[in-house]
């Protein structure tokens, strides 16, 4: 049995401080056959979580301690003409635009959110945080 307590969280924060990425993952899966996303992530201010998405599943973000923003993005597609008057080629350019910022802080009663399937997102850590 795994207990999520102050001792475990303090240990994760200490390991995150030693990690150049300023974060530490704790895998809570109990077997190799378990392919679920069962992990704790200790995140320190300054960590960079690349903007990413999960095309086939939602992501539940539960903040156990700390303060952070979950930032959601949408794809913006633009088509531009490249070339001269003799040969025109159309280039497809994809960019991401921030559409929503969800502030999470358990002491303010804001415990988590659900990121929709396929939604681009990242986090901005305001103070040391642990998410499940």
Predicted regions span which residues?
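General beta-strand recognition
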Residues: 50, 69-71, 130-132
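Short beta-strand-initiation
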Residues: 23-26, 36, 46, 56, ...
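A short, N-terminal "cap"/entry segment at the start of jelly-roll beta-barrel domains
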Residues: 1-36, 50, 81-104
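Conserved metal-binding segment of the jelly-roll/cupin
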Residues: 46, 104-127, 131
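Conserved short histidine dyad/triad with adjacent acidic residue
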Residues: 40-55, 76, 106
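Glycine- and acidic-residue-biased ligand/ion/polar-headgroup-sensing regions
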Residues: 56-78, 83-89
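His/acidic/aromatic-lined binding-pocket segments of jelly-roll/cupin-type domains
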Residues: 40-41, 52, 58-63, 113, ...
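Short, surface-exposed beta-edge/turn micro-motifs
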Residues: 36-38, 57-59, 110, 128-129
């Amino acid at each position: 049995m795994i207990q999520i307590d102050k001792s475990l969280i303090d240990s994760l924060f200490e390991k995150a401080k030693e990690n150049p990425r300023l974060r530490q993952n704790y895998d809570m899966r109990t077997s190799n056959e378990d392919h679920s996303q069962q992990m704790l992530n200790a995140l320190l201010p300054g960590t960079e979580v690349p903007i990413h998405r999960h095309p086939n599943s939602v992501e539940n973000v539960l903040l156990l301690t700390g303060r952070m923003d979950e930032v959601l993005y949408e794809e913006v597609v633009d088509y531009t003409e490249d070339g001269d008057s003799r040969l025109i080629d159309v280039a497809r350019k994809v960019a991401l635009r921030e559409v929503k910022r969800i502030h999470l802080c358990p002491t303010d009663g804001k415990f988590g959110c659900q990121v929709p399937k396929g939604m681009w997102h990242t986090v901005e850590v305001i103070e040391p945080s642990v998410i499940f």
